[in-house]
């Protein structure tokens, strides 16, 4: 059984027990979370539900494991011959969640 959900403008394939990192959500660690933006659902027995754009009656229950930041990336802007250099760093925040069950 798996589902494809949308969170933070991105799509994720999730199954029961899977751990994923999504864009930062305003939820504390340890709290339960209901994701009802389900785009696709497959129960494993050949029954498939495709949303238009969302599947009605299907939701994903997850627990927030932690809030964190990804590794730092360097953003470097440069203009030749003009002595213009700009160096910045960026760490994108994320929320790590564990899918507990998919309710259909």
Curated annotation (Swiss-Prot):
Lineage: Bacteria, Bacillati, Bacillota, Clostridia, Eubacteriales
Gene (UniProt): rplU
Alphabetical GO biological process terms: translation
GO cellular component: a single term: ribonucleoprotein complex
Subunit structure: Part of the 50S ribosomal subunit. Contacts protein L20.
Record keywords: Ribonucleoprotein, Ribosomal protein, RNA-binding, rRNA-binding
InterPro entries: bL21-like, bL21-like_sf, Ribosomal_bL21, Ribosomal_bL21_CS
Family to which this protein belongs: Belongs to the bacterial ribosomal protein bL21 family.
PANTHER family linked: 50S RIBOSOMAL PROTEIN L21 (PTHR21349), LARGE RIBOSOMAL SUBUNIT PROTEIN BL21M (PTHR21349:SF0)
UniProt function note: This protein binds to 23S rRNA in the presence of protein L20.
Record protein name field: Large ribosomal subunit protein bL21
Species assigned in the record: Syntrophomonas wolfei subsp. wolfei (strain DSM 2245B / Goettingen)
Pfam families: Ribosomal_L21p
Molecular function in Gene Ontology: rRNA binding; structural constituent of ribosome
């Amino acid at each position: 059984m798996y589902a494809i959900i949308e969170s933070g403008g991105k799509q994720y394939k999730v199954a029961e027990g899977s751990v994923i990192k999504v864009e930062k959500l305003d939820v504390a660690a340890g709290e339960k979370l209901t994701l009802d933006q389900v785009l696709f659902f497959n129960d494993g027995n050949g029954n498939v539900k495709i949303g238009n754009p969302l599947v009605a009656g299907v939701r994903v229950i997850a627990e927030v494991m932690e809030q964190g930041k990804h590794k730092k990336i360097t953003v470097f802007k440069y203009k030749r011959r003009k002595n213009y250099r700009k160096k910045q760093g960026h760490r994108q925040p994320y929320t790590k969640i564990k899918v507990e069950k998919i309710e259909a």
